[in-house]
Every structure is written in C-alpha cells, then in structure tokens.
UniProtKB/Swiss-Prot annotation:
Its EC number is 3.1.3.18. SUPFAM superfamilies: HAD-like (SSF56784). Specifically catalyzes the dephosphorylation of 2-phosphoglycolate. Is involved in the dissimilation of the intracellular 2-phosphoglycolate formed during the DNA repair of 3'-phosphoglycolate ends, a major class of DNA lesions induced by oxidative stress. The lineage of its organism: Bacteria, Pseudomonadati, Pseudomonadota, Gammaproteobacteria, Pasteurellales. It comes from Haemophilus influenzae (strain 86-028NP). GO terms for cellular component: cytosol. It comes from the Bacteria. GO terms for biological process: carbohydrate metabolic process; DNA repair; glycolate biosynthetic process. This is Phosphoglycolate phosphatase.
Amino acid sequence: MNTQFKLIGFDLDGTLVNSLPDLALSVNSALAEFNLPKAPEELVLTWIGNGAPVLIARALDWAKKQTGKVLTETEVKQVTERFNFYYGENLCNVSRLYPNVKETLETLKEKGYVLAVVTNKPTRHVQPVLAAFGIDHLFSEMLGGQSLPAIKPHPAPLYYLCGKFGFEPRQVLFVGDSKNDIIAAHAAGCAVVGLTYGYNYNIPITESNPDWVFDDFAQLLTIL
C-alpha cells in the first residue's frame, strides 16, 4: 500500500464504465419524441461529462443547428425528463466495464484503500450502474450530480470526501478521464491520474496535465 494515499476517488463514465452506447440511445430516444434528429454516437461522446442537463443542452443546441427548431423552456425540461426516463430503463443494456477495472478495484480494496466514486451522473443512477457490474460494495461513498451543491470541476466533492473520512487532500488520489476530473483534483490539492481511453471531448487528457497518464486501468497498481 502506498503510504501517501489513503483514499482513491474515481470518476464513473469513461473511467470505470463505457456507458456511451446506452447514453447515446437514451439521448436519441428523447430527441425522437420531439421530432429531432438522431445524433451520431461519436458526437454524443463529446457532450458527456458535465451532468444530464448540460448533456441535453448540448444535444438540443446541435439539433437546433440541424433543424432550426427552438424548444421552449418547458420542452427543454421535458426532453431532460425523458432522457432520464430512458436512461433509467437502459442503464446497462450495452454498457461495459473497461478492461481490468473490477480486478484492480478488488486489489485496491484488499490493500486497504478507501474507495469512492465522484461523478456528475444523476445521483439516482450511480449505485444501480455500479451494482449491475457487481462493484458497488467496493465503494465507501458514491457521489452523483445531485449529492452536493457543486459538481466537478468544482473541488467540493473532493473536499467532502476529505472531511467525511478525515484525510488531507494530499492523502487522496483521484482517477478520471476528463479535464473536469483533473481541474477538480488540482483545485482540491489532490494528485490525479488521467486515463486516455475515456470521454474527454476528444481532447488528449495530457493537455490537462494530470500527475500520471495511463492507458490501462490496471496501471494504477504501478503507483499504489
């Protein structure tokens, strides 16, 4: 066990789980109800990372450019609600854990690290997704988009973990795939690993200057 770090926090989408196919399906199902075009999966990928409301706002902005159709504030809220409905029904139809995630998490847990999830994903979806892959029991805390007043890239979730478990920021390592993860960790004073395989708006994670850059989740064991 690395004696510097006591707690390891993880992003969810694009870090632990490849959820893009189910997210894209749910976005397009919601758009279709309002006679809006279907977005390519590779485009939906660039919209992920700031929570459901921002995801839908980006989708509607794209749809507006395609069709010229502008939705009312009420309709925008309805699209978001329909997205949440469809995603709730399709959390893990085709989503998959990334390679070596479960085994690596189990090893870290056995080594004595406190594990936590910090995601901007709607809070009500977090535990069900983790449970679907049989890894929810490995985490001592699971924070979603509605768990706290602020979400990443704000450092509040990491400060919360420090306070709850009694650790200093230097004792926390965060692992994510997006610039939001790197910014939040740096702002909180935590070390951070950037993963290259996730959803960072098609921007290389190296540009956000994480402390380590890994291509494979199992590489965490080289520093822990």
